[in-house]
């Protein structure tokens, strides 16, 4: 038990040092997407989805991203009574061009599907995206995510704000 606690304290100290490094490497975003949930009879159901993202660029090409989202087939119930909710923690590998950036995402997600689809699961999430920068700090964002081998997928358009700019 003592060894476990000392390992946890050491890892927390290392992570806190990285997190304290630079606020300029933080970014956040929001988006609206068309989500698709796989129904047990083999068909797909299209859902409107709202999502929010927070991320930290650790290096120029490596970052960590957390995304949460909520989806429903009725626009009035996306936040109040969603059919699907998800939370994902992903590693982000990115490459920046002049005014654009492309990236790959991969990680773990928790997916809750309700209202007779009855699927609550944790699994892998993979995706890719592109940022088109209008100025130094704000980007138009397009990305696609695939949860748990196709159980749920999203194609998102939104924005991302980079505190330190994209350079």
Write out the residue ranges for each language-model feature.
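Cleavable N-terminal export/targeting peptides
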Residues: 1-25, 166-167
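Short glycine/proline- and aromatic-enriched beta-strand/turn motifs that initiate or cap beta-hairpins
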Residues: 20-64, 68-74, 93-94, 101-104, ...
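Solvent-exposed loop/turn segments connecting transmembrane beta-strands
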Residues: 39-45, 77-83, 96, 114-122, ...
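Residues that act as N-cap/strand-start positions at coil-to-secondary-structure junctions
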Residues: 48-50, 85-87, 124
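Predominantly the C-terminal beta-signal and adjacent terminal strand-loop region
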Residues: 72-77, 122, 126-167
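Outer-membrane beta-barrel porins/channels
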Residues: 83-90, 151, 160-161
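Short, contiguous, well-ordered secondary-structure segments
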Residues: 84-105, 146
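Mid-chain, well-packed structural core segment of small domains
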Residues: 101-115, 119-123
């Amino acid at each position: 038990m003592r060894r476990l606690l000392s390992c946890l304290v050491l890892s927390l100290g290392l992570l806190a040092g990285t997190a304290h490094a630079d606020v300029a490497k933080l970014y956040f975003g929001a988006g609206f997407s068309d989500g698709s949930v796989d129904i047990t009879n083999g068909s797909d159901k299209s859902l409107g989805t709202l999502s929010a993202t927070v991320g930290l660029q650790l290096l120029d090409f490596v970052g960590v991203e957390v995304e949460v989202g909520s989806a429903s087939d009725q626009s009035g119930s996306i936040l109040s009574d969603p059919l699907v909710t998800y939370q994902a923690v992903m590693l982000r590998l990115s490459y920046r061009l002049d005014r654009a950036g492309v990236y790959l995402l991969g990680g773990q997600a928790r997916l809750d599907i309700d209202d007779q689809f009855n699927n609550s699961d944790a699994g892998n999430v993979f995706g890719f995206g592109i940022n088109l920068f209008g100025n130094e700090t704000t980007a138009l964002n397009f990305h696609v995510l695939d949860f748990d081998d196709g159980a749920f997928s999203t194609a998102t358009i939104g924005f991302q704000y980079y505190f330190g700019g994209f350079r």
